[in-house]
């Protein structure tokens, strides 16, 4: 369905975001790594509690909720799929960044999850993590690496992805139940998206 021009009402209790899909079809020249003592750890068969904890710490302020709502069996099947790789950015011995690379599509890699905790925003850790993501993705037989971001994300996210070499190719509107109204997310998060009941 294509939305008509003009305003479209969103029912109370719902949230709506404009989602931008971005891609690259050739390996980019990576920007130089920033200074930092981070490391990357691959997490084979991640536990659901570990994953959801890091997912919340990275994304709760930006209304990441899909993996919190996802039933345990479905999330476990996804996380343990052989073509899906999960990594943690480690800072001072603690997991502070999340990277999910999905190679299930033929000849492509989707960066399904990408982000760092609030403690590392603005430190260069995200840039460092993106360099690792692109190194890993393009070391495989892929012709395309893609991801998506939305208007709920950090205000610098879209420009960051473009600086990293991605170009926008599609836009959608996503409408969902507000996760702050059913306890999926705390009521006080994401103040940039007002709760309307």
Q: Which stretches of residues belong to each language-model region?
A:
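Acyl-donor-binding surface of acyltransferase catalytic domains
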Residues: 1-39, 44
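A conserved beta-strand-loop-helix scaffold within acyl/acetyltransferase catalytic domains
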Residues: 66-73, 79-118
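Acidic/histidine-enriched, glycine/proline-rich intrinsically disordered or flexible terminal extensions
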Residues: 2-17, 175-197
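Conserved GNAT acetyl-CoA-binding A-motif
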Residues: 137-149
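Conserved glycine-rich acetyl-CoA-binding loop
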Residues: 117-131, 140, 152-156
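Short amphipathic alpha-helix that is part of the acyltransferase structural core
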Residues: 34-66, 187
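Conserved beta-strand-loop-alpha-helix junction that forms the acyl-donor binding cleft
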Residues: 121, 147-157, 174-180, 184
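Conserved active-site alpha-helix within GNAT-family acetyltransferase domains
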Residues: 3-8, 152-171, 178
């Amino acid at each position: 369905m294509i939305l008509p021009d003009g305003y479209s009402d969103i029912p109370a209790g719902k949230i709506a975001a404009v989602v931008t899909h971005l891609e690259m079809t050739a390996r980019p020249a990576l920007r130089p790594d920033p200074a930092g003592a981070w490391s990357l750890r691959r997490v084979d068969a991640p536990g659901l509690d570990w994953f959801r904890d890091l997912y919340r710490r990275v994304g709760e302020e930006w209304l990441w909720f899909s993996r919190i709502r996802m039933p345990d069996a479905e999330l476990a099947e996804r996380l343990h799929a052989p073509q899906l790789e999960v990594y943690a950015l480690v800072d001072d011995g603690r997991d502070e960044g999340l990277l999910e690379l999905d190679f299930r599509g033929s000849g492509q890699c989707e960066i399904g999850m990408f982000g760092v905790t609030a403690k590392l925003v603005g430190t260069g850790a995200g840039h460092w993590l993106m360099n690792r993501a692109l190194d890993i993705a393009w070391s495989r037989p892929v012709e395309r690496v893609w991801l998506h971001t939305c208007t709920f994300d950090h205000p610098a996210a879209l420009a960051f992805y473009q600086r990293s070499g991605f170009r926008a190719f599609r836009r959608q509107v996503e409408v969902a139940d507000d996760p702050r109204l059913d306890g999926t997310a705390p009521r006080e998060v994401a103040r940039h998206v007002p709760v309307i009941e």
